A protein has these predicted regions:
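Short, positively charged interaction helices/loops
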Residues: 48-85
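Extended hydrophobic secondary-structure segments
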Residues: 16-21, 36-39
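Acidic-enriched, low-complexity/disordered segments with a strong bias for Aspartate over Glutamate
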Residues: 29-32, 37, 63, 71
Length: 85
């Protein structure tokens, strides 16, 4: 069994696209982990150029995207702009 790594977490206020957050929360719920744990895993995999999700999880993500109307893709990431308040 892998050795546990002790870390220090900090609270942060991050703004995310509304539908993206719903998908992330839904995915975290299906994995029975916190949103923070999910985000840490995604980022750590990305930092090493590794895919964070397997085929089954990608299917779950596709389903959650449909449920929440999320049509954004990786190509959208550099094009996002907020509506003026």
């Amino acid at each position: 069994m892998p050795k546990t790594v002790i870390i220090e977490r900090v609270q942060t206020g991050v703004r995310l696209e509304k539908r993206l957050l719903k998908v992330l929360k839904g995915l975290a719920d299906t994995k029975d982990i916190t949103l923070g744990d999910l985000l840490e895993g995604i980022v750590l995999h990305a930092f090493e150029g590794k895919a964070p999700f397997g085929r089954e999880t990608l299917k779950t993500i596709t389903d959650l995207k449909k449920i929440h109307g999320l049509d954004l893709t990786a190509a959208s990431s550099h094009l996002l702009s907020e509506k003026p308040r």
